[in-house]
Curated annotation (Swiss-Prot):
Top-rank taxon, per record: Viruses
TM helices/strands, residue ranges: none
UniProt GO MF annotations: ATP binding; ATP hydrolysis activity; DNA binding; DNA helicase activity
Compartment annotation: Host nucleus
Enzyme class, first EC level, given as a word: isomerase
Lineage start: Viruses, Monodnaviria, Shotokuvirae, Cossaviricota, Papovaviricetes
Binding site residues for ATP: 453-460
Assembly and oligomerization: Can form hexamers. Interacts with E2 protein; this interaction increases E1 DNA binding specificity. Interacts with host DNA polymerase subunit POLA2. Interacts with host single stranded DNA-binding protein RPA1. Interacts with host TOP1; this interaction stimulates the enzymatic activity of TOP1.
Phosphoserine carried by residues: 89, 93, 107
InterPro entries linked to this entry: Helicase_SF3_DNA-vir (IPR014015), P-loop_NTPase (IPR027417), PPV_DNA_helicase_E1_C (IPR001177), PPV_DNA_helicase_E1_N (IPR014000), PPV_E1_DBD (IPR046832), PPV_E1_DBD_sf (IPR046935), Rep_E1_papillomaV (IPR016393), Znf_lg_T-Ag_D1_dom_sf (IPR037102)
Residue interval(s) of motif Nuclear localization signal: 83-85
GO cellular component: host cell nucleus
Native source organism of the sequence: Macaca mulata papillomavirus 1
The entry's keywords: ATP-binding, DNA replication, DNA-binding, Early protein, Helicase, Host nucleus, Hydrolase, Isomerase, Isopeptide bond, Nucleotide-binding, Phosphoprotein, Ubl conjugation
Protein name from the UniProt record: Replication protein E1
């Protein structure tokens, strides 16, 4: 690149461009007026820009700016309302951090001028400021209900009553955002008690219950007076209270319907009777285990503010009567054992289920359900009941036992089907009676009866029906590998071994000869010591004739064999031709009582029973107050 000031010409785009100025006038020439430089001040360009358009445009922007300012102010006020802040003096903090000060109170704007930056943190105060104008941190607004009523309901469901200028209509008064909260609040203000304290909540409208509590608002006074007569066809018990308020009559009803109903059915029924909309009613079932609720119904029922029809429900009586209250607090195991003994319940599950169902009518059962040791009580009750039953059974003779079984069996049986079945099988009835007499007495060598025959001849049907009537025990050879398979014989008056096979007969021939004799044997019991006992009469059914088989020749003299040869008959409907049940066996033993040489009891109790009634409940001493 050439140095600066080089006179040489450049080449291309970098070359120097030489222009020679054209001078038309020289120094000393006369200048004309048109070319005078002193007059060239730019005055001729004053009107070069037209300002008329600008003034017109400025006049159009003023309304827009005003509208923008108004909208901005409106938006700011809306935001302030939503944030629940005051729009007034800046000295009032939205958080309520207001400290009284003379300068601030006199001139809040002057107090805002400060050189020090104040702290924005809230300070704790011992006393809240109270200017008398009711300034609060949260801005609350009252919801005025449409209509001429005098009830204002706040957003939270609370209410403030004001004098009513005109007649109020419950239909219009209850048109609010939270209808149920309004009804509950009005109920508490009228009756002085919360509706939820008297009832328990059902989430489903289709849950069935017999007892219902109804709170209806806006009922006409004439309808409320006639409800006592209108509701009688539907209820067996009704407790009616009617109190007036600015909505009309607020009715409270506790009703026990004749059949179980759900909330929808009760709502339709009461809406028809009271001429009130279903949405204007509170319907819930009562609290059955609340002593306070039961006491409320009891106290109001005996006062003059209520009308009561029917008998008081048992859940009210049980919790309000003094005697019932004492009984509910104490559980007596002896009463439970006595109940299980009287009903012949010895199984734990049956005792627990049946006794729990008595909680509604038995105070001791109710106390049993309230206990935390129900499993222990059930186990102890079943154990004691089995002990009592076993001791009672051991003390009874066979005649007493059969007599007791006959007393517990219903009448109406016939002894003829049993005799006809024996004759159908070719069994001599007189021989059978003779063998049965010795069998029941436990005579040695006559302590076992064997029913032999081909399959489907009714051997098991005949033997099972007899054992069921005599409430005997069943043993099975399938458990012979256990040391305790003969344990049921220790608690039985009569026993049965069904379907003895050749292996079973071999086992009996090897180990149970003395059992068939009716002599004392030793039986091993689980978790207990060995017991020495006399084997009860044993009935055996088999398809093998052990009385004639030479393999078991030592058993021939120890058993009496009856052969069933004919197949068991059925009618065209599949029912047995010869019905063998407890009623027929009762008739059979009553008919053949003397032939079986069963003894009659000479001394009986006043009620005619053969044995003294067992009582395990402790005696009670009556004390006068």
């Amino acid at each position: 690149m050439d140095p600066e000031g080089t006179p040489g010409e450049g080449v291309g785009c970098t070359g120097w461009f030489n222009v020679e100025a054209i001078v038309e006038r020289k120094t000393g020439d006369v200048v004309s007026e048109d070319e005078d430089d002193t007059e060239d001040t730019g005055i001729d360009l004053v009107d070069f820009i037209d300002d008329t358009c600008g003034s017109v445009q400025t006049g159009d922007e003023a309304p827009g700016a005003l509208l923008h300012a108004q909208e901005t102010q409106a938006h700011a006020e809306a935001v302030q309302v939503l944030k629940r802040k005051f729009v007034g003096s800046p000295a009032v903090s939205p958080l309520g951090n207001y400290n009284p000060c003379v300068d601030r109170d006199l001139s809040p704007r002057l107090n805002e001028i400060s050189l020090n930056q104040g702290s924005g943190q809230a300070k704790r105060r011992l006393f809240l400021p109270d200017s008398g104008y009711g300034n609060t941190e949260v801005e609350t607004s009252l919801l005025q209900v449409a209509g001429g009523g005098g009830q204002d309901v706040q957003a939270g469901g609370k209410e403030n009553t004001r004098p009513d200028d005109g007649g109020g209509d419950a239909t219009q008064l209850l048109r609010c955002s939270n209808l149920k909260a309004t009804l509950l609040s009005k109920f508490k203000s009228v009756y002085g008690v919360s509706f939820s304290e008297l009832v328990r909540s059902f989430k489903s409208d289709r849950t069935t219950c017999a007892d219902w509590v109804v709170g209806a608002a806006g009922v006409h006074h004439s309808v409320a007076e006639g409800l006592k007569q209108l509701i009688q066809p539907f209820c067996s018990y009704a407790h009616i209270q009617c109190l007036t308020c600015d909505w009309g009559v607020y009715l409270l009803l506790l009703a026990r319907f004749k059949c179980g109903k759900n909330r929808l059915t009760v709502s339709k029924c009461m809406s028809t009777l009271l001429n009130v909309q279903e949405t204007h009613m509170l319907i819930e079932p009562p609290k059955l285990r609340s002593a306070a609720a039961a006491l409320y119904w009891y106290r109001t029922g005996i006062s003059n503010v209520s009308e009561v029809i029917g008998e008081t429900p048992e859940w009210i009586t049980r919790q309000t009567m003094f005697q019932h209250g004492l009984e509910d607090s104490i559980f007596d195991l002896s009463e439970m054992v006595q109940w299980a003994y009287d009903h012949d319940f010895t199984d734990d599950s049956v005792i627990a289920y049946e006794y729990a169902q008595l909680a509604g009518i038995d105070s001791n059962a109710a106390a049993f359900l309230k206990s935390n040791a129900q499993a222990k009580y059930v186990k102890d009750c079943a154990t004691m009941c089995r002990h009592y039953k076993r001791a009672e059974r051991q003390q009874m003779t066979m005649s007493q036992w059969i007599k007791q079984r006959c007393e517990k069996t219903d009448d109406g049986g016939d002894w003829r089907p049993i005799v006809q079945f024996l004759r159908y099988q070719g069994v001599e009835f007189i021989a059978f009676l003779a063998a049965l007499k010795l069998f029941l007495k436990g005579i040695p060598k006559k302590n076992c009866i064997v029913l032999f025959g081909p399959p489907n001849t009714g051997k098991s049907y005949f033997g099972m029906s007899l054992i069921h009537f005599l409430q005997g025990s069943i043993i099975s050879y399938v458990n012979s590998n256990s040391h305790f398979w003969l344990q049921p014989l220790a608690d039985a008056k009569v026993a049965m071994l069904d379907d003895a096979t050749p292996q079973c007969w071999s086992y009996i021939d090897n180990y149970l000869r003395n059992a068939l004799d009716g002599n004392p044997i030793s039986v091993d019991r689980k978790h207990k010591n060995l017991v020495q006992m006399k084997c009860p009469p044993l009935l055996i059914t088999s398809n093998t004739n052990a009385g004639q088989d030479d393999r078991w020749m030592y058993l021939h003299s120890r058993m009496v064999v009856f052969t069933f040869e004919q197949p068991f008959p059925f009618d065209q409907n599949g029912n047995p031709v010869y019905e063998l049940n407890d009623k027929n066996w009762k008739s059979f033993f009553s008919r053949t009582w003397s032939r079986l040489d069963l003894q009659e009891e000479e001394e009986t109790e006043n009620d005619g029973s053969t044995c003294r009634a067992f009582k395990c409940v402790a005696g009670q001493n009556l004390r006068t107050v």
